[in-house]
Each structure stands twice: as structure tokens, then as C-alpha cells.
């Protein structure tokens, strides 16, 4: 699109901004013969011819300019909305930043819980289980399964080899109403009650922001 606009500007400059040799030739043409009466008549005729030529050229150039603009707009890959994007660049950047900032809320404190507690942004007044947990040790997003608990035979290699595929992990999941099974690639927990994450010093889980 930018290339098309540059070509359009170059063509407009070439056709409409440079002096016309024909017009210069008319301006430099002698204004009449040696006789006094022929001079005034020649001047009037020459002026009328130049005015007519200018009017004709003006309409022709306007039509050519409209045609060039229409050709650009009719290109298959031309995005007509791009001009609006350029005009409202600053306002659009502001509108983009606003929702991003709105999605940058973190739980404080961070809670784990059983399936009876809803998930969401945890605060001191709104005790919800964080569902945007991430492990800073293995850099994995924490998965959780409602109404399940981990089998006691689970070990590090099991999660290392099977995360985050549920069809593989479910071989070590046991149904338990009210429980919630959490796991990353290096740690796992079964939780039934609302628990402050800071109380478990072995876990290196943090809220990944909502």
C-alpha cells in the first residue's frame, strides 16, 4: 500500500507540478505582426486560446487525478481503513493499552483450594483460588483438576514425562469429591481447603496475572 501511495505522489508531481512546455511555448510566442492593428487582435486571440487550453488541461488533469486515486482504492490488497488507522494512531494506542492494563491484576494473597471454592482473583476480602498459576522453577503453567486427587505413587519423573497431557496424567488421578489436584512439571499437590500459597514453602508457584 505504501509503495502504491509513493507511486501516486510521484505521478501527481510529474503530471501536475512541473511546468508544461506547451504552455511556455504559448507564452513566449510573438504577440503579432509588424502592423499596429494586427497586434491587438493577435493578443486577444492568443489570450482566448490560452484560456481555453488552460480550462481544458485543468479538467483533464482533475479527471486523471481522480482516476489515479480510484485505481489505488480499487487494488485488491488496498485497505481503505488504513487511513483511519493512521489518523487515530495515538488514540488507538491508548485504547489498546487500556485492556492490557486491565488484564494485569495479580492475586494477593494467592490461594489454592478444593473444588468447592470458585476460581478467580484472590484478595483478602474475596477468597478465590488462583487459576493463573505458573511455576518459576520449571516455567510451566499449573494445571488443576476438580474433584480429583493425586495417587501417592506419583513422582517427579511421572510429571516430567507426562505434563501437560491429561490423557497421560489421568493414570495417576483418583476421583475425590471436593478435592482439587494441582501440578506443574516439577511439583504437585492435592488441596481440599482454602490455603494461602505462602504457607507451603516448597512450592515455587506464583500468580501469572489475570
Swiss-Prot record:
Bias type Basic and acidic residues, positions: 41-59
Compartment(s): Cytoplasm; Photoreceptor inner segment
Region (Required for interaction with FAM161A): 1-77
Start and end residues of each stretch annotated as Disordered: 24-59
A GO cellular-component term linked to this record: photoreceptor inner segment
Alphabetically ordered keywords of this record: Cytoplasm
Signal peptide: none
Regions that span the bilayer: none
GO terms of biological process kind: photoreceptor cell morphogenesis
Pfam families from the UniProt entry: RMP
PANTHER family, A to Z: CILIA- AND FLAGELLA-ASSOCIATED PROTEIN 418, PROTEIN C8ORF37
Assembly description: Interacts (via N-terminus) with FAM161A (via central region); the interaction is direct.
Function: May be involved in photoreceptor outer segment disk morphogenesis.
Protein name (Swiss-Prot/TrEMBL): Cilia- and flagella-associated protein 418
Amino acid at each position: 500500500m505504501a509503495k502504491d501511495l509513493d507511486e501516486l505522489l510521484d505521478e501527481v508531481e510529474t503530471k501536475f507540478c512541473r511546468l508544461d512546455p506547451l504552455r511556455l511555448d504559448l507564452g513566449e510566442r510573438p504577440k503579432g505582426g509588424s502592423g499596429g492593428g494586427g497586434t491587438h487582435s493577435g493578443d486577444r486571440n492568443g489570450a482566448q486560446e490560452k484560456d481555453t487550453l488552460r480550462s481544458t488541461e485543468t479538467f483533464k488533469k482533475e479527471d486523471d487525478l481522480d482516476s489515479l486515486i480510484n485505481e489505488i482504492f480499487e487494488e485488491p490488497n488496498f485497505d481503505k481503513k488504513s487511513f483511519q488507522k493512521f489518523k487515530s494512531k495515538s488514540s488507538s494506542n491508548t485504547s489498546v493499552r487500556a485492556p492490557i492494563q486491565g488484564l494485569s491484576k495479580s492475586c494477593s494473597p494467592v490461594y489454592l483450594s478444593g473444588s468447592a471454592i470458585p476460581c478467580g482473583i484472590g484478595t483478602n476480602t474475596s477468597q478465590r483460588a488462583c487459576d493463573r498459576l505458573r511455576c518459576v522453577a520449571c516455567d510451566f503453567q499449573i494445571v488443576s483438576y476438580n474433584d480429583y486427587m493425586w495417587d501417592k505413587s506419583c513422582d517427579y519423573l511421572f510429571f516430567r514425562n507426562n505434563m501437560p497431557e491429561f490423557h497421560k496424567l489421568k493414570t495417576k488421578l483418583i476421583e475425590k469429591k471436593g478435592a482439587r489436584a494441582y501440578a506443574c512439571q516439577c511439583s504437585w499437590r492435592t488441596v481440599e481447603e482454602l490455603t494461602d500459597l505462602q504457607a507451603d514453602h516448597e512450592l515455587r508457584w506464583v500468580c501469572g496475572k489475570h
